[in-house]
Amino acid sequence: MISVILPTYNEAENIRRIIPAIAKVFQDEKIQGEVIVVDDDSPDGTAGIASEFGNSFPVRVYVRKSDRGLSKAVMKGFELARGEICVVMDADLSHPVEKIPDMVRPILEGKCDVTVGSRYVVGGGAHNWPLVRKAISKGAGLLAKGVTVLSDPTSGFMAVRKSILNGVKLDPLGWKIVLEVVVKTRARVTDVPIVFADREEGESKLGLKAQVDYLRHLGRLYAFRYPLFLEFVKFCLVGLTGLVVDTAVLVSLVDYVGLDPRFAALFAFATAVSWNYVFNRVWSFESGRSA
């Protein structure tokens, strides 16, 4: 069974179109499947519209009133899914529903555990993207190359074998649940070419906050992937601040207090050592301390 997860917020017009489109793909390809709409309590009635399809097609709707956000909605979808394979896609029709069979086939054939819809492989692309948006997408992808080999790390179109999520602690921030799953599970991944289309109805959710969340999320994933390297970087940063503290205390005691430079140096050194010890303990090596 295939579970298609649609995270939604104010997608009333699009949900009317995407659910019948998915139903047609299931019927044409003889796929046994369901659609799970996880809605963040949309004021435009998205959840109610989605529920209306339940009489003719296996659609389940879950409305979340707290802890909102795209990635958290998808995680709830994983929890609710009855299928062995979960397909995650945007509800705004930017991801081609006709590609669902291509997304699940490699997993069913045992070739991989995750497929990711890619705009950056042969056969993929994006309709009418301006140069600036292409540059932002490429730049965001390059920043993620240290944690994944995906050709399109910022993709939101994914199929995943649900069993690989068992025991994996997913803690996404923002909207890149695909990147979270791929990095945390270290699964076998296959790229599937897709042509991305901009939404026709509704407003994009990609604002400044989403971009900042992406950078913060990347920081978490780098820390997960390279924990020792991160501790080393923190240790070096604390060392630099300790040098500043040492110098500031020394200058203050000599120039403003008039203390003998030899005694001032000893006091400054002791202060810097204490500073470094405290901050290394509570920040640089916090993971080891909590373990």
Residue ranges of each PLM-predicted region?
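Membrane-interface starts of transmembrane alpha-helices
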Residues: 259-268
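Acceptor/aglycone-binding surface of glycosyltransferases and processive sugar-polymer synthases
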Residues: 62-80, 85, 97-175, 199-209, ...
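A conserved acidic beta->alpha catalytic loop
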Residues: 39-47, 93
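Hydrophobic helical membrane-anchoring modules
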Residues: 1, 147, 170-251, 255-256, ...
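Short, well-formed alpha-helical segments that are part of the catalytic scaffolds
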Residues: 11-26
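Conserved donor nucleotide-binding strand/loop of the catalytic core
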Residues: 32-37, 47-80
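Donor nucleotide-sugar binding loop of glycosyltransferases
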Residues: 11-14, 42, 70, 96
